[in-house]
Amino acid sequence: MAAAADERSPEDGEDEEEEEQLVLVELSGIIDSDFLSKCENKCKVLGIDTERPILQVDSCVFAGEYEDTLGTCVIFEENVEHADTEGNNKTVLKYKCHTMKKLSMTRTLLTEKKEGEENIGGVEWLQIKDNDFSYRPNMICNFLHENEDEEVVASAPDKSLELEEEEIQMNDSSNLSCEQEKPMHLEIEDSGPLIDIPSETEGSVFMETQMLP
């Protein structure tokens, strides 16, 4: 751990001290073993002083959090020295620094955030087509929220309830139609036998109806 002093202008008359801390970064989710050697020791860090910083190395993005190590992490650097006149090289390890803080980073896939979309936590699902071993951008990331889970589970009982209500309504309507038909039959039966009207009366009745204005 090293401390560096950053002096302000003489007008302020105050000194501001910035504390520096060495952190061991562990990257997980890398497929290529030569990934770090190809990135030329360049990276971008976002939110390094937050609980969950984000690290970008080449085209890969990592997210993680700080942890305390079980022991002390000692870091050495390699120095290559010529051991003999035959040209055999000998690698010598030289102490560089040590730390007890670790930053565990995991490979993360980012999705575009739409305007007006709220930041709601959820489960990230990665869907890959069968027998598709192409590069990672073919993965589709979507978030499934707890409310959506409850809606999916509750949809089946709702459908069964709707079907039951429709059956009850149909039964009620059929019962009403039967009840309405029964009194009609009773009235016809109670009205007594039909009286045959002679043909002459039928004609007179017909003529009278024709003469009405």
Swiss-Prot record:
Biased composition, class Basic and acidic residues, residue ranges? 1-11
Question: What cellular component terms from Gene Ontology apply here?
Answer: nuclear body; nucleoplasm; transcription factor TFIIIC complex
Phosphoserine modification sites?
S9
Q: What GO molecular function terms would the record report?
A: DNA binding; RNA polymerase III general transcription initiation factor activity
The organism's superkingdom is given as Eukaryota
Where does the UniProt annotation locate this protein? Nucleus
Identify the keywords attached in UniProt to this record, alphabetized: Acetylation, DNA-binding, Nucleus, Phosphoprotein, Transcription
An example Pfam family from this entry, by short name, is: TFIIIC_sub6
Region listing for Disordered, in residue ranges: 1-20, 191-213
N-acetylalanine PTM positions = A2
Per its UniProt record, what InterPro entries does this chain match? Answer: GTF3C6-like, TFIIIC_triple_barrel
Q: Which GO terms describe its biological process?
A: 5S class rRNA transcription by RNA polymerase III; transcription by RNA polymerase III; tRNA transcription by RNA polymerase III
Main location (coarse class): nucleus
| Protein's job | Involved in RNA polymerase III-mediated transcription. Integral, tightly associated component of the DNA-binding TFIIIC2 subcomplex that directly binds tRNA and virus-associated RNA promoters.
Task: Tell me the subunit arrangement.
Answer: Part of the TFIIIC subcomplex TFIIIC2, consisting of six subunits, GTF3C1, GTF3C2, GTF3C3, GTF3C4, GTF3C5 and GTF3C6. Interacts with GTF3C4 and GTF3C5.
Q: What family does this belong to?
A: Belongs to the TFIIIC subunit 6 family.
Protein known as: General transcription factor 3C polypeptide 6
Which species is the source of this protein?
Homo sapiens
